[in-house]
Amino acid sequence: MSIAQQLMDMGFPADKAEAAAGNNRNLDQALDWIEKDGAGVPMETDAPAQAAPGAADSGAPPVAASFKCDDCGKLLANDDAIMFHASKTKHENFSESSEAIKPLTAEEKAAKVLEIREKIKVHQAKKAKLEAEENREKEKKRREDGKAMISHKEAARDREIREAAQDRRREKNEDEIARKRVLEQIRLDKEARKAKASGQPVPEAKPAPSAAPVAPPKDYSTTTLQFRLLDGQTVRQQFEANEPLAMVRAWVETNHANGVPFTLMTPFPRKVFTEDDMGTPLKVLNLVPSANVILNRAA
């Protein structure tokens, strides 16, 4: 935020705030300029220009010495003071007044500057507190996303271990079937040799029935999602079918979003996912055993 904007936030008129912030002054320098020059202070009690002596006797119409707020009775020096007073109090009724405003003394002006400095300190303290709260929220979200990614990696590792165990069991079963087939063939060969040696007819060798291929069960414990990213590229990633959509979003946000806000949707059937869907498992959202997911920039 610029120095001039900070001064305007504290109640200075725009033109005077710009003047105080000129020459690349920082906030303290601008306040020093205000304190010495006085032109930038949004005082409602600045003294108006005094009419020349005898002006009332010249026959000219009287010149207003000040302006008065008809809502509260406060005397105001000029248009800037009227606008400043109206913005603070929401008062709307003003009129000219012949009553002159007593000029501020040097001590009163210095006290006014100190008062404004104190207001600026309060404003800066509030701003610093707000920034600290925002930083805490960002850090909290970063940690939550990190925990979600760790949980996802652990789930992926467990899934790989289960799949490896399934592969080992399948290989063991296949080896056992092959071993039984070899033993059966050896038995048949022995019987054939015995029959031939005894002059008996050799029994017709019947091929051992091959094990019927067993169709692998449909395992929908996992799903493969293909993402079309914001830059048009596509990537694939596997997730647990019972994982919530929030895990998918966390993975995309960490690896491919590059800090750009986004939404998730499926093209067929078309569905745009909202915050209400983040806790729903992928299986319930019909994203199993595979699905296409498109990233769109958030509005």
Swiss-Prot record:
Residues 218-295 form the UBX domain. Residues 46-61, 201-213 have a biased composition (Low complexity). One of its GO terms (molecular function) is K48-linked polyubiquitin modification-dependent protein binding. Residues 111-179 form a coiled coil. Residues 39-61, 127-176, 191-218 are annotated as: Disordered. GO terms for cellular component: cytoplasm; nucleus; perinuclear region of cytoplasm. InterPro entries: UBA-like_sf, Ubiquitin-like_domsf, UBX_dom, Znf_C2H2_type. Disruption phenotype: RNAi-mediated knockdown does not cause any visible phenotype. Simultaneous RNAi-mediated knockdown of ubxn-2 and ubxn-3, causes 50 percent embryonic lethality. The surviving hermaphrodite progeny are sterile due to a lack of sperm. Abnormal accumulation of sex determination terminal factor tra-1. Germline development is normal. In males, sperm production is normal. Expressed in the germline (at protein level). Expressed in spermatocytes but not in mature sperm (at protein level). Ubiquitously expressed. Predominantly expressed in the spermatheca. The keyword Coiled coil applies. Its main location: cytoplasm. The keyword Cell inner membrane does not apply. SMART domains: UBX. Residues 128-176 have a biased composition (Basic and acidic residues). PROSITE patterns: UBX, ZINC_FINGER_C2H2_1. GO terms for biological process: cell differentiation; IRE1-mediated unfolded protein response; masculinization of hermaphroditic germ-line; negative regulation of proteasomal ubiquitin-dependent protein catabolic process; negative regulation of protein K48-linked deubiquitination; negative regulation of protein ubiquitination; positive regulation of protein catabolic process; spermatogenesis. It comes from the Eukaryota. It is found in: Cytoplasm, Perinuclear region. Keywords: Coiled coil, Cytoplasm, Differentiation, Spermatogenesis. Interacts with cdc-48.1 (via N-terminus) and cdc-48.2 (via N-terminus) in vitro; the interaction with cdc-48.1 is not detected in vivo. Ubiquitin-binding protein which acts as an adapter for ATPase cdc-48.1 and/or cdc-48.2, conferring substrate specificity. Together with ubxn-2 and ubxn-3, plays a role in hermaphrodite spermatogenesis probably by promoting the degradation of sex determination terminal factor tra-1. This is UBX domain-containing protein 1. It comes from Caenorhabditis elegans. The lineage of its organism: Eukaryota, Metazoa, Ecdysozoa, Nematoda, Chromadorea. The gene is ubxn-1.
